[in-house]
C-alpha cells in the first residue's frame, strides 16, 4: 500500500519536473483489489419481507428499509420524503421525484408495487409532514442491525446496502444503465456498472 502511494507521488514529481524519472517505476508490488460492494440479495429481501416485527419502531425501520430497497433512496432521502415528492403519470403509474440530499441531483423513480403498499400505510396527504415518521439514523440503525443478525449476516446491514440491492435488482432485470443512473440520481453514468 505504501509503495502504491510512493509511486503516485514520484509520478507527480516527474510530471512537475522535480525528478527526471521515477526511481521505483519497475519495482513490483502487490496492488490492492477494489472492494466488493455489499448489497441485499433477493433471497435476503424475501426473508425480510416475511418477518414482520412486533415493536413499533422496529417495524417502521423494517418497512423503511424495504422501501429503500425498492426505490433506491438513501435513509436521508426517505427521511425528507414528503407527499409533494410523490406523483402520478398520465398512464396512472405513481413515481417519486426528489433531489438527493447528498448530491442535490434529482431522482425520478417509478414505484414498485411493494413500495406503493408501504406508502399506503403512512402519510401521503399532509404536505407539511414527512411520509415516514422516522427517528434519527442512529436509533433506527440498531433495528436494521438486528434484522441483519436475524438474517445471519456477518457484516452490519445498512440502508446503503439496500440502495446497492436496488441497483443490482435493476441490472438483473436488464434495465438500461441510463435509466438506473436517473433512478439512483448518479452523477457518473458508469457508477451502476460497479455493482
What spans do the regions from the language model cover?
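Short, cationic motifs built from Arg/Lys/His that form the positively charged side of catalytic pockets
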Residues: 7, 60, 74, 107, ...
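Non-catalytic DNA-binding core/recognition domains of DNA-processing enzymes
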Residues: 1-12, 27, 111
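Conserved small/polar residues in nucleotide/adenosyl-binding loops
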Residues: 187-195
Amino acid at each position: 500500500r505504501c509503495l502504491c502511494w510512493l509511486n503516485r507521488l514520484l509520478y507527480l514529481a516527474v510530471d512537475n519536473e522535480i525528478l527526471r524519472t521515477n526511481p521505483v517505476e519497475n519495482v513490483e508490488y502487490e496492488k490492492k483489489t477494489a472492494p466488493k460492494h455489499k448489497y441485499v440479495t433477493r433471497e435476503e429481501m424475501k426473508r425480510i419481507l416475511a418477518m414482520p416485527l412486533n415493536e413499533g419502531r422496529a417495524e417502521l425501520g423494517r418497512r423503511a428499509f424495504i422501501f429503500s430497497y425498492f426505490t433506491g433512496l438513501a435513509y436521508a432521502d426517505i427521511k425528507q420524503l414528503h407527499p409533494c415528492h410523490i406523483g402520478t403519470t398520465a398512464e396512472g403509474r405513481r413515481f417519486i421525484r426528489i433531489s438527493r440530499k447528498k448530491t442535490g441531483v434529482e431522482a425520478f423513480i417509478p414505484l414498485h408495487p411493494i413500495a406503493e403498499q408501504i406508502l399506503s400505510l403512512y402519510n401521503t396527504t399532509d404536505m407539511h409532514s414527512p411520509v415516514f415518521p422516522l427517528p434519527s439514523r442512529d436509533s433506527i440503525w440498531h433495528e436494521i442491525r438486528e434484522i441483519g443478525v436475524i438474517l445471519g449476516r456477518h457484516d452490519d446491514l445498512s440502508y446503503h446496502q439496500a440502495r446497492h440491492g436496488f441497483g443490482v435488482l435493476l441490472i438483473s432485470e436488464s434495465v438500461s444503465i441510463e435509466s438506473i443512473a436517473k433512478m439512483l440520481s448518479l452523477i457518473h453514468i458508469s457508477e451502476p456498472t460497479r455493482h
